[in-house]
Regions:
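Glycine-rich phosphate-binding loop
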Residues: 164-202
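Short glycine/serine/threonine-rich phosphate/pyrophosphate-binding segments
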Residues: 62-64, 130-135, 159-160, 179-189, ...
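Glycine-rich phosphate/diphosphate-binding loop of Rossmann-like nucleotide-binding domains
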Residues: 118-160
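C-terminal binding/interaction regions
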Residues: 125, 166-167, 204-248
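Short glycine-rich or small-residue beta-strand-to-loop segments that form or flank ligand, phosphate
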Residues: 53-54, 78, 120-126, 175-177, ...
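Glycine-rich oxoanion-binding loops at beta->alpha junctions
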Residues: 106-110, 147-168, 213-214, 230
Length: 248
């Protein structure tokens, strides 16, 4: 339930259109709903501006299906991250509107039309191998109502590729930079644009990359100001922060 839905509910009670007992039934499950194996945070959108997101890693197909089924009884959009194709198939049986992005491993059910923001979030990847994380960020940002511009494969090994897209990147309200290896792209971008840069280290790279640790440390020790760093492969977290910056 979001603020708009809550206001409409109260207006219906005030006008006599909705009986008080019916309104109480609608509100009874606030602020959470206990499903046994999971407890849905029904107030998440009211507090944060977006509904609870399902993190599928470690969950079974049956658990994801149960959670989605419960969320479908509400009115909000639904996003699941780190979802498998088997989970997507199970959810598709519940809703024909379910859309699966196999690259980003995201599952989206959009139930409310909202115009995208006039300003946009730029999502910049160092290499094609970083795109799964970037797609998770893009799908999250789009569902939260943001306009998104994807700028792929412009890493520091070919800096001219980045410079060719610099004008577009500078127009963004916030920039998400997704990079593995040594993670240098975040510092380079932050040195060229007057916008907040949200750096996402990825686990892409050979041995001494340590599954993203080298990129994480490189981004944390960036000499360029205005860089914020999220956890390794956390495209979702980067999109949440970028959305807060981009939304009016």
């Amino acid at each position: 339930m979001n603020e708009t839905t809550l206001r409409l509910l109260l207006e219906r009670v005030r006008s006599g259109e909705l009986a008080i007992d019916n309104a109480v039934n609608r509100l009874r499950e606030l602020p959470f709903r206990d499903l046994g194996e999971a407890v849905l945070d029904s107030h998440r959108e009211l507090r944060r501006g977006h509904p609870e997101v399902i993190y599928c890693a470690g969950k079974t197909v049956a658990q994801v299906r149960t959670i989605v089924a419960a969320m479908l009884e509400g009115e909000g959009d639904i996003l699941a991250t780190c979802a498998t194709s088997e989970m997507a198939e199970a959810v598709a049986e519940l809703s024909p509107d379910a859309r699966y992005n196999p690259l980003g491993r995201t599952l989206v059910i959009r139930r409310r039309a909202r115009p995208p923001t006039a300003t946009f979030i730029a999502i910049v990847t160092a290499g094609t191998s970083d795109q799964p994380v970037a797609e998770e960020a893009a799908e999250t940002a789009l569902l939260f109502g943001n306009r998104v511009e994807r700028i792929n494969d412009v890493g520091v090994a070919g800096l001219h590729r980045l410079l060719a897209r610099l004008e577009l990147i500078r127009e963004a309200r916030a920039v998400i930079v997704v990079a593995g290896m040594e993670g240098a792209l975040a510092s380079v971008v932050a040195g060229l644009v007057a916008r907040p840069v949200i750096a996402v280290p990825t686990s892409v790279g050979y041995g001494a990359n340590f599954n993203g640790l080298s990129a994480l440390l490189g981004m944390l020790t960036s000499c360029a100001g205005g860089v914020g760093v999220v956890n390794i492969d956390n495209g979702f977290g980067a999109a949440c922060l970028a959305s807060l910056i981009n939304q009016p």
